[in-house]
């Protein structure tokens, strides 16, 4: 809802770069160090071209790629865009697992991990372990955003993120629901919630299902 920011829907854009590394340069993702400066420039331009083609706001100063499975891609992202800013969003682990389990995802290899609570818990644990490892070993510029903090104090929490992005506050941010409505179809698993007001009922919701954890 900020005029200077465009958020790209949850699309695996970085996967296209990974495929190009394998098909064009014949390297595995464990061989990123073998890529030359020229190779990186080609890959960088490839990603940016795809990213911009998926933008709604062509005048946006900042583009946010919010594909949720990009944690495992941080080494590649950091290599291509060492000055990029990472916003790591998280919430209570139990609520995260429950929410993923309750979503109606389009079937694919990644989403199959959410077919039951146990499998969802394992993929969450793996993802968080990867994050904890990468954030100490990689020189990444990041800020964390906790869902519960957002619910508790929306304006101050958003302001903290805007300051990190070097963007000023805009009153239109409060109208995020109207912005979502105007976009029409939203291709995210939680699309029905995007147009809803922020609510506290989702906090600690997992306790209603505690016996399943």
Describe every region a protein language model picked out.
Residues 68-70, 148-151:
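Short, internal active-site loops enriched in acidic
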Residues 74-77, 149, 155:
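Short gly/Ser/Thr-rich phosphate-binding loop of adenylate-forming enzymes
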Residues 20-21, 27-61, 97-144, 152-213:
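PAPS-dependent sulfotransferases, especially Golgi type II membrane carbohydrate sulfotransferases
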Residues 6, 85-87, 143-145:
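Hydrophobic/aromatic beta-strand patches that form the interior of the parallel beta-sheet core
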Residues 71-74, 95-96, 128:
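Conserved coil-to-alpha-helix start sites within the AMP-binding
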Residues 12-14, 91-96, 149-151:
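Conserved nucleotide-binding/hydrolysis micro-motifs of P-loop NTPases
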Residues 1-81, 89-90:
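Phosphate-binding active sites in nucleotide-utilizing proteins
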Residues 76-102, 161:
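Conserved phosphate-donor/acceptor-positioning beta-strand/loop module used by diverse small-molecule
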């Amino acid at each position: 809802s900020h005029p200077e920011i465009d958020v790209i829907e949850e699309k695996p854009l970085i996967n296209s770069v990974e495929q190009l590394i394998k098909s064009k340069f014949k390297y595995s993702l464990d061989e990123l160090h073998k890529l030359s400066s020229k190779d990186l420039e080609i890959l960088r331009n490839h990603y940016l071209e795809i990213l911009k083609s998926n933008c709604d706001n062509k005048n946006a100063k900042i583009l946010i790629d919010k594909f949720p499975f990009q944690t495992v891609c941080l080494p590649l992202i950091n290599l291509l865009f060492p000055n990029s800013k990472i916003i790591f969003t998280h919430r209570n682990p139990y609520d995260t697992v429950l929410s993923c389990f309750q979503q109606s995802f389009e079937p694919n290899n990644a989403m199959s991990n959410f077919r039951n609570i146990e499998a969802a818990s394992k993929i969450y644990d793996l993802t968080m372990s990867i994050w904890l490892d990468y954030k100490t070993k990689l020189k990444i510029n990041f800020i964390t955003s906790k869902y519960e903090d957002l619910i508790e104090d929306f304006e101050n929490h958003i302001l903290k993120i805007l300051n990190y992005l070097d963007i000023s506050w805009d009153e239109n941010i409060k109208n995020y629901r109207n912005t979502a409505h105007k976009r029409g179809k939203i291709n995210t698993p939680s699309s029905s919630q995007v147009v809803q007001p922020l609510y506290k009922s989702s906090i600690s919701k997992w306790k209603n299902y505690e016996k399943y954890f």
